[in-house]
A protein has these predicted regions:
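Bacterial N-terminal signal peptides that target proteins for export
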Residues: 1-9
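Targeting-peptide/extracellular-domain and disordered-appendage signature
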Residues: 4-5, 17-162
């Protein structure tokens, strides 16, 4: 009986630890999307004339996902601060949808610091943003995405899905 009770306690401990790992989202899925240089955005001058808080940049362009999947990337970026944290730097919030064909999407959102005179990050710069959801096989996705503007002007977006 004592051996049976010890086995039962051990089994319950393993089950509890697996439940904790499951609740913590330990699946660790990584999805990588690449694309060439970002095309010129549609620029909407919403605030004061010229670069200012409220201005928007909008894009839609193709990328490549796992297994050479064609990915459509729709991106909205809004200026939220000028000369912050230093002169010549803008704070911008981005929302983007990465569509993997059909109903599979990953959504990101977050703030990055950008050169005031540029539409995108400088080459060799990286910014991290939150994964705020998804649809299809990515339904309810959470985690973070690391977007890197590579030195050759291409881009790599690495989604770290919990």
């Amino acid at each position: 009986m004592r051996l049976h009770a010890t086995s039962l306690v051990a089994a319950l401990a393993v089950a509890a630890s697996l439940s904790i790992v499951s609740c913590a989202g330990g699946s660790g899925t990584t999805v990588v999307v690449t694309h060439p240089a970002v095309p010129k955005p549609t620029y909407v001058d919403k605030g004061d004339e010229g670069p200012s808080v409220g201005d928007e940049r909008l894009w839609s362009f193709p990328g490549t996902g796992p297994g050479d999947t064609v990915v459509t990337i729709d991106w909205i970026m809004t200026t939220t601060g000028e000369d912050t944290p230093e002169k010549g730097v803008e704070s911008r919030i981005s929302s983007a949808v990465f569509s993997f064909g059909g109903s599979d999407t990953l959504l990101l959102q977050g703030v990055g610091l950008y050169p005031g005179d540029g539409a995108t990050l400088k080459p060799s710069a990286t910014v991290a943003r939150a994964i705020v959801g998804g649809t299809g096989k990515y339904e309810g996705a959470t985690g973070w995405v690391e977007s890197t503007h590579n030195a050759d002007d291409t881009w790599t977006h690495t989604f770290h899905i919990d």
